[in-house]
Amino acid sequence: MSRLAKRHPDLLSCNFNQDYSCIAVGHKKGYTILNCDPFGKVHSNNDQGATGIVEMLFCTSLVALVGAAENQPSNSPRKLQIVNTKRQSTICELIFPTSVLAVKMNRKRLIVVLENEIYIYDISTMKLLHTIETGPNPNAVCALSSSSERSYLAYPSPVPSASSTPLSSSAIPAPPPAPTTGDVLLFDTISLTALNVIQAHKTPIAALALNSTGTMLATASDKGTVVRVFSVPDAKKLWQFRRGSSSARIFSINFNLMSTLLAVSSDTSTIHIYRLASSRKGGKDADDASTEEARSPTPSETPLASSPPLAAGKLDSHSAASSLRRRSYHLGKSFVGGVGGYLPKSVSEMWEPQRDFAFIKLRGNHGRTVVAMSATVPQVMVISSEGLFQAYNIDLENGGECSLMKEFALLGSEDFGNGSNGI
């Protein structure tokens, strides 16, 4: 999740790129791209205006931007811009019916998340391939694998309405209800087919993460006491980790690039790092009283597999939006509505959840945090809504508490808006 609590008066968003080598920062004057190691500014644009979302495509010059000015059409939160920072040119612009809450990219697909819909594009042509109606997802909870071969999308599964009526071609169906259980839907963005429904938790999903190869999915619920890791796409539970005994709001989950460690940040002062040991060991459900089940759809329950791709174009057409809603509604109604008939693939396990391998104690009022692990040095990196970048050394043999080694400001004085004195 890239949007941060606005502790720093000028910081609007902040996130790592797919391999955690760079940081993309959105602020009131525009956006900035920073290198992690060595830390430093790579590119900035202070003429863009307030920018609420900045997403990079690895270390390329392709960047996705979403504005944060409701009263300025040129910088609207409904407008997505794809820009080339090297050429300083705009590749394309798309207007959406509601505010864009998140953008995800890999080398094959671009994903745009609205509160009730997810749009899937071919990133090479910006052709709209498919739209999924998700039901209310105001926190834009989703994850896209950075792998081109396993380009999987995970998002909270909508709960089917008990009073659902057959879909009429003459009317736009009501949106599916908001997710009230901890089911996760796994979707293949290449074949445009639903792969699995995972009963990950019994309370709503708060955070999701896919590893770099698209073979593991980490999940956390809004209870925030347990983090689980499942294999993808067969959805077998591999690990279960204890974050704490008290509830917490999970801010971020990230695997390292080797998929040997998993880092989790929350609204507590502790960041947890878990070791994904070779002995893949599940755990007794700490926030669930029943067995988790991984469920696979039958061919008759995956209508998207036979649906032809949708045409590209601007999305401000009422008729086009109506068509997208009618087509994508089948995912929530037919596929998710039939999960009760799927066979369970796993049984309850008897081990207690594993504790963390290493941890970071944050000082002071840290606000919202995003955590990631360096691919080049044994360090855990933390960016915060205070406008700080911090790097902590981690002992990969013994674990324990990580030590702070570096700290830098994400915004320079030239990035500050009027009346701001910085950090």
Swiss-Prot record:
<dbReference type="InterPro" id="IPR048720">
    <property type="entry name" value="PROPPIN"/>
</dbReference>
<dbReference type="GO" id="GO:0044804">
    <property type="term" value="P:nucleophagy"/>
</dbReference>
<dbReference type="GO" id="GO:0000422">
    <property type="term" value="P:autophagy of mitochondrion"/>
</dbReference>
<dbReference type="GO" id="GO:0015031">
    <property type="term" value="P:protein transport"/>
</dbReference>
<keyword id="KW-0653">Protein transport</keyword>
<protein>
    <recommendedName>
        <fullName>Autophagy-related protein 18</fullName>
    </recommendedName>
</protein>
<comment type="similarity">
    <text>Belongs to the WD repeat PROPPIN family.</text>
</comment>
<dbReference type="GO" id="GO:0000329">
    <property type="term" value="C:fungal-type vacuole membrane"/>
</dbReference>
<dbReference type="InterPro" id="IPR015943">
    <property type="entry name" value="WD40/YVTN_repeat-like_dom_sf"/>
</dbReference>
<comment type="function">
    <text>The PI(3,5)P2 regulatory complex regulates both the synthesis and turnover of phosphatidylinositol 3,5-bisphosphate (PtdIns(3,5)P2). Necessary for proper vacuole morphology. Plays an important role in osmotically-induced vacuole fragmentation. Required for cytoplasm to vacuole transport (Cvt) vesicle formation, pexophagy and starvation-induced autophagy. Involved in correct ATG9 trafficking to the pre-autophagosomal structure. Might also be involved in premeiotic DNA replication.</text>
</comment>
<keyword id="KW-0072">Autophagy</keyword>
<dbReference type="GO" id="GO:0032266">
    <property type="term" value="F:phosphatidylinositol-3-phosphate binding"/>
</dbReference>
<feature type="repeat" description="WD 2">
    <location>
        <begin position="245"/>
        <end position="284"/>
    </location>
</feature>
<feature type="short sequence motif" description="L/FRRG motif">
    <location>
        <begin position="241"/>
        <end position="245"/>
    </location>
</feature>
<dbReference type="GO" id="GO:0061723">
    <property type="term" value="P:glycophagy"/>
</dbReference>
<comment type="subunit">
    <text>Component of the PI(3,5)P2 regulatory complex.</text>
</comment>
<keyword id="KW-0853">WD repeat</keyword>
<dbReference type="GO" id="GO:0010008">
    <property type="term" value="C:endosome membrane"/>
</dbReference>
<dbReference type="InterPro" id="IPR036322">
    <property type="entry name" value="WD40_repeat_dom_sf"/>
</dbReference>
<dbReference type="Pfam" id="PF21032">
    <property type="entry name" value="PROPPIN"/>
</dbReference>
<keyword id="KW-0677">Repeat</keyword>
<dbReference type="GO" id="GO:0000425">
    <property type="term" value="P:pexophagy"/>
</dbReference>
<keyword id="KW-0926">Vacuole</keyword>
<dbReference type="GO" id="GO:0034497">
    <property type="term" value="P:protein localization to phagophore assembly site"/>
</dbReference>
<feature type="region of interest" description="Disordered">
    <location>
        <begin position="281"/>
        <end position="317"/>
    </location>
</feature>
<feature type="compositionally biased region" description="Basic and acidic residues">
    <location>
        <begin position="282"/>
        <end position="295"/>
    </location>
</feature>
<keyword id="KW-0813">Transport</keyword>
<dbReference type="GO" id="GO:0005829">
    <property type="term" value="C:cytosol"/>
</dbReference>
<feature type="repeat" description="WD 1">
    <location>
        <begin position="200"/>
        <end position="240"/>
    </location>
</feature>
<keyword id="KW-0472">Membrane</keyword>
<dbReference type="GO" id="GO:0030674">
    <property type="term" value="F:protein-macromolecule adaptor activity"/>
</dbReference>
<dbReference type="GO" id="GO:0034045">
    <property type="term" value="C:phagophore assembly site membrane"/>
</dbReference>
<dbReference type="GO" id="GO:0080025">
    <property type="term" value="F:phosphatidylinositol-3,5-bisphosphate binding"/>
</dbReference>
<dbReference type="InterPro" id="IPR001680">
    <property type="entry name" value="WD40_rpt"/>
</dbReference>
<keyword id="KW-0967">Endosome</keyword>
